């Protein structure tokens, strides 16, 4: 399965080829008709048409739609000049577009399930009410010693692989049936490491929970995502909004544990998990810092022909309908300013254009500098790397957490 999904990987093997061929054939014919290049029948009136949606592509008027996106609520563009007021209004605007109400359901945790020992830390499962809709089972790692400890909310990627979620980042110690898949994922993206285990070994409490559709809460299939998203919209809810609310709830649960120093809680994620990390930092006061690996771009720059995000499906986990009429991706992340935030990007990452990364970084830099907190924003690009989170990068992130928490 080649790399290329905005959350980690592209369509499952074979899907892209068949859809792409159909899209080419249909799209080519439609393009000829819509641009007036097709030869009309004898005696027929020639009509130039526009406003098409060729199969598998952007609408032909997408440049006009992009021109209409001015992101008027962005800091520096918005008429609001007081940053605290702007942050409050911007956060409220994001929350309005989640289509999922805030949740104050009691967590009612059950600790101590499936305990095990790691290298300097203890593993256990914890079951708690993530939302009013149900309880989930999380992986909770606690360093040996006396707390309270700093903590990391670890947010998994997408990758078009649904049999594992939290196990992509925390070694499955009680379910051997998931170990082979988890190890293969770690080998592919994380230099063979389990990021959560490494964080716990370095002294951090770690919580990882399956997003809706993965692991214990799935598995869904790639093809079912679009229907799942549509059904939630029809029920007045949102797939992306649900994930955002759940991540905020998970942050609150982690920060409230007795073993955790609630002033030193960070969010960390790779790919879709990176999107989740900066989004959670923007929406939750329980997150003091965030590290985002391989997901930051300007919206206009990622919405280009051939980009993976155009396929739909996985994109629904990161799509808040209508929000783009107010804020760009880096504008949402900027709601977290002036918290310490680290963004890592691979220069060879096929999912994000260099221009998109540049635009996003410039916006982020301007916001943190406006708060006289430029030193709290760390933007790093590794020209030789693609869509990966390597062992040296992991060490960089943990060292950075050590310095800011």
Which role fits each region the language model picked out?
Residues 1-19, 32:
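N-terminal secretory signal peptides
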Residues 19-28:
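N-terminal export leaders
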Residues 102-145:
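N-terminal cap/lid segment of alpha/beta-hydrolase-fold proteins
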Residues 148-157:
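Short beta-strand element of the alpha/beta-hydrolase
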Residues 156-245, 302-304:
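Cap/lid segment of the alpha/beta-hydrolase catalytic domain
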Residues 226-270:
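Gly/Ser-rich "nucleophile elbow"/oxyanion-hole loop immediately N-terminal to the catalytic nucleophile
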Residues 233-234, 289-333, 353, 357-361, ...:
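Mobile cap/lid helix-loop segments that gate and shape the active-site cleft of serine hydrolases
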Residues 367-405:
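C-terminal catalytic histidine-bearing segment of alpha/beta-hydrolase fold enzymes
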């Amino acid at each position: 399965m080649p790399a290329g999904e905005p959350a980690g990987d592209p369509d499952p093997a074979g899907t892209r080829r068949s859809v792409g061929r159909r899209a080419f054939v249909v799209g080519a014919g439609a393009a000829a008709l819509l641009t007036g290049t097709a030869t009309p029948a004898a005696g027929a009136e020639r009509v130039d048409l526009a406003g098409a949606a060729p199969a598998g592509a952007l609408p032909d008027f997408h440049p006009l739609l992009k021109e209409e996106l001015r992101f008027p609520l962005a800091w520096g563009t918005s008429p609001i000049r007081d940053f605290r007021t702007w942050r409050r209004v911007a956060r409220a605007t994001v929350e309005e577009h989640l289509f999922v109400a805030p949740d104050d359901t009691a967590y009612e945790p059950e600790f101590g399930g499936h305990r095990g020992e790691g290298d300097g830390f203890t593993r256990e499962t914890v079951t708690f009410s993530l939302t009013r809709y149900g309880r989930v089972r999380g992986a909770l790692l606690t360093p040996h010693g006396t707390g309270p400890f700093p903590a990391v909310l670890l947010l998994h990627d997408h990758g078009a692989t649904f049999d594992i979620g939290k196990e992509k980042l925390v070694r499955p110690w009680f379910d051997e049936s998931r170990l082979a898949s988890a190890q293969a994922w770690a080998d592919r993206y994380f230099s063979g490491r389990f990021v959560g285990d490494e964080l716990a070994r370095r002294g951090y409490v770690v919580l990882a929970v399956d997003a809706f559709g993965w692991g214990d809460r799935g598995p869904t299939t790639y093809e079912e995502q679009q229907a799942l998203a549509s059904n939630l919209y029809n029920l007045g809810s949102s797939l992306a909004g649900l994930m955002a609310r759940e991540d905020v709830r998970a942050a609150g649960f982690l920060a409230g544990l007795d073993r955790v120093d609630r002033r030193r809680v960070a969010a960390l994620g790779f790919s879709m998990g990176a999107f989740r990390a900066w989004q959670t930092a923007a929406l939750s006061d329980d997150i003091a810092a965030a590290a985002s690996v391989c997901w930051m771009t300007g919206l206009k720059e990622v919405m280009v022909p051939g980009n993976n995000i155009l396929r739909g499906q996985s994109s629904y986990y990161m799509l808040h309908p209508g929000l783009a009429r107010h804020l760009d991706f880096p504008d949402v992340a900027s709601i977290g300013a002036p918290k310490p935030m680290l963004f890592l990007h691979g220069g060879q990452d096929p999912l994000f254009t260099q221009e998109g990364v540049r635009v996003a970084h410039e916006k982020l830099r301007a916001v943190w500098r406006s708060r006289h907190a430029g030193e709290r924003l760390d933007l790093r690009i590794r020209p030789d790397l693609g869509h990966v989170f390597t062992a040296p990068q992991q060490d960089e992130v943990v060292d950075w957490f050590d310095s800011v928490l």
